[in-house]
């Protein structure tokens, strides 16, 4: 199999594991003293090598016409002193070319063991993905051939390669000041900065030239559900990919700078995440096996790795917030007793505190669970990252509802069934975990209409005066504005599609559901809007401080809750079914601009295919988002008019971002269908099939000729 010279040089020998073998692949036999299972693994490695690798690398591993030597100084110049687990990871990910991971895990372990042995090492135990043993030492500088490849003559010198930009030269630590007010060219945190606004002041791309956007570069990501919003810092893009792989790319060209591949245990299913976080010289990652890992932002090497305490039977879908030197992470769960938010020191990884998102007996708020014991209290998941207000010094987190609706539906006399802290905003002091205040947006949620989403911090005109506020909305399309310092209620804006809230207290903001729409086994079927899988949902909003306008997309769907004699999706005894609204015109995608000072919708744009990506706003009056029909588009912030669109080879699944490198502005989208909006909603548009092959990629656009 012919492969490019660049690939041969990059791998320093490992280049073509995986073509049909043309030889026996005889390798040096090991001397006695090895454990029988290790001898068996080496024998298996020779068989696998002969079958898959020898045709390119030579039967004796010394190289062939198309691939280099896998033993000796040239090979060890690249792989000497490296943990065998990294060699295993490389082979597993990259070999055979174009088919990485297609061999059994035992084959990859056997190949890594063979390469260790052929380079003078002695396998101390069976080699696997997590082996701690290292390769033999690298040769002294100058003793290894510069290329180490067969089939290349030194008759004529190679021309000089184009110079590569060192994006990490002069790296300076990321500070709280940077995260709270990022430089225009950077996208440093989820929603760009700690304010959670999803807004960039960059001005090169405008309503007048946005039609000239075209692909600047693209990079494949591991196939699978991918919804993480990339980060960009000084020309480096960081992306979390499926299977807990993290990438650093040159943000101007897409050239990979490094990759981290988490070796997950067999019982840990890989989960998509919404974000990763930068702090100091570290990139903080929440893993699917419920660890927090700090990677060196320049190399991808782990700086610390700690398990999240009290995380059994939880999952990590959101992503970390790092503020005031503290890493915070929320977890999702339906376990007894509810879920948690955990905190760690950003420099050392030392655990600082846990907070129970379901109030416990005897604790503040513990008397709001209908007299239930702790073990019978459920929910309070946190599957979205938080925000941080540097003015108040408070970290702001949203909490979801409880699926266990039955035990709290009907009030026990003398009790309270609000169910704190479900559907609440929590304001913490990051270093201590002190809960400074909370505000519950929707008490006793019987419909799975979470308020767990982003907390947007901004200054909005209230009674003619600017006021520091927090804005957030639930699935029902109601957006509350509360005071950033105290959590006191200010106002609610309504997107206009919910049908079950009949009153909102103007002083407290408490919402009153229509009692006729309370679902249960003892009642008739209930029809209401929106559906828990529709409405405003996983895709976050964007906010323009200068115009007091919040931009949000939603899905115009409703639900029928049907009673069951036994069981049910909700423990109140009902199953949930999707439905179109009674007066639907078949346009299920909604995009709105909401005046948060007036509490009114300024404009609305509708389309057939539901939106799937979050919203990005820019200082030139543009909005970017994406939809289920594999389309990304730009709109005018003032009117909602569509100005540009482009097709992609996958469903845009994360929020778009924008950044600049060397004076050129880029807009990036991540594909990789997998957030919950892809469940159920495609049935509303059967003529728009979702991709059968779930690939993932980063697509980066820029203006032609810039």
Where do the PLM segments sit?
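The canonical Cys-X-X-Cys-His
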Residues: 45-60, 111-115
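Short, conserved, GDST-rich strand-edge loop motifs in beta-rich repeat architectures
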Residues: 329-335, 339, 397-419, 556-584, ...
């Amino acid at each position: 199999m012919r492969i490019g010279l660049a690939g041969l040089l990059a791998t320093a020998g490992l280049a073509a594991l995986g073509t049909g073998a043309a030889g026996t692949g005889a390798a040096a036999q090991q001397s006695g003293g090895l454990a029988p299972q290790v001898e068996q693994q080496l024998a298996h490695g020779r068989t696998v090598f002969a079958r898959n690798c020898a045709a390119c690398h030579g039967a004796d591993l010394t190289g062939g016409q198309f691939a280099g030597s896998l033993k000796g100084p040239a090979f060890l110049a690249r792989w000497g002193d490296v943990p065998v687990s990294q060699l295993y990871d490389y082979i597993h990910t990259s070999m055979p070319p174009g088919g990485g991971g297609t061999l059994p895990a035992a084959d990859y372990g056997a190949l890594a063991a063979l390469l260790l042995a052929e380079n003078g090492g002695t396998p101390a135990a069976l080699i696997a993905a997590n082996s701690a043993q290292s390769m033999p030492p690298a040769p002294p500088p100058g003793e290894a051939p510069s290329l180490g490849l067969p089939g290349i003559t030194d008759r004529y010198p190679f021309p000089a390669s184009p110079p590569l930009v060192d994006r990490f030269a002069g790296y300076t630590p990321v500070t709280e000041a940077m995260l709270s007010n990022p430089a225009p060219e950077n996208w440093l945190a989820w929603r760009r900065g700690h304010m959670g606004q999803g807004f960039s002041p960059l001005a090169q791309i405008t309503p007048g030239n946005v039609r000239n956007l075209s692909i600047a570069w693209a990079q494949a990501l591991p196939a699978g559900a991918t919804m993480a919003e990339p980060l960009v810092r000084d020309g480096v893009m960081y992306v979390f990919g499926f299977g807990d792989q993290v990438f650093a790319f040159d943000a101007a060209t897409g050239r990979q700078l490094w990759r981290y591949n988490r070796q997950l245990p067999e019982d840990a299913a890989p989960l998509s995440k919404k974000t990763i976080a930068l702090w100091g010289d570290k990139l903080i990652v929440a893993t699917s096996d419920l660890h927090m890992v700090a990677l060196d932002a320049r190399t991808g090497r782990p700086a610390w790795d700690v398990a999240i305490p009290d995380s059994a039977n939880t999952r990590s879908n959101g992503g970390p917030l790092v503020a005031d030197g503290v890493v915070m992470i929320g977890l999702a769960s339906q376990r007894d007793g509810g879920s948690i938010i955990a905190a760690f020191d950003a420099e050392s990884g030392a655990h600082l505190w846990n907070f129970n998102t379901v109030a416990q007996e005897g604790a503040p708020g513990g008397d709001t669970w209908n007299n239930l014991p702790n073990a019978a209290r459920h929910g309070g998941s946190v599957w979205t990252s938080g925000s941080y207000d540097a003015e108040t010094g408070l970290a702001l987190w949203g909490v979801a509802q409880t699926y266990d609706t039955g035990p709290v539906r009907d009030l026990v006399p003398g009790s309270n069934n609000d169910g704190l802290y479900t559907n609440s905003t929590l304001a913490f002091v990051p270093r201590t975990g002190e809960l400074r205040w909370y505000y519950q947006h929707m008490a006793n949620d019987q419909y799975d209409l979470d308020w767990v989403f982003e907390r947007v911090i901004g200054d909005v005109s209230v009674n003619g005066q600017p006021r520091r506020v927090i804005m957030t909305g639930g699935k029902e399309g109601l957006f509350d504005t509360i005071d950033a310092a105290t959590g006191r209620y200010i106002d609610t804006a309504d997107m206009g599609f919910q049908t079950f809230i009949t009153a909102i207290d103007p002083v407290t903001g408490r919402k009153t559901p229509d009692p006729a729409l309370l679902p249960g086994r003892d009642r008739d079927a209930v029809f209401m809007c929106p559906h828990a899988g529709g409405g405003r949902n996983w895709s976050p909003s964007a906010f323009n401080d200068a115009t007091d306008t919040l931009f949000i997309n939603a899905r115009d769907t409703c639900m029928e809750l049907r009673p069951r004699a036994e069981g049910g999706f909700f423990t109140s005894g009902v199953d949930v079914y999707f439905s179109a609204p009674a007066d639907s015109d078949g346009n299920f995608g909604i995009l709105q601009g909401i005046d948060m000072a007036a509490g009114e919708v300024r404009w609305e744009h509708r389309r057939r295919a539901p939106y799937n990506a979050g919203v990005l706003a820019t200082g030139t009056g543009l909005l970017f988002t994406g939809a289920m029909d594999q389309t990304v588009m730009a709109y005018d912030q003032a009117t909602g008019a569509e100005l540009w669109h482009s097709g992609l080879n996958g469903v845009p699944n994360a929020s778009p971002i924008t950044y600049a490198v060397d004076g050129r502005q880029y807009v990036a989208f991540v594909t990789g269908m997998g957030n919950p909006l892809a469940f159920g909603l495609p049935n509303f548009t059967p003529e728009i099939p979702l991709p059968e092959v779930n690939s993932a990629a980063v697509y980066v656009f820029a203006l032609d000729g810039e």
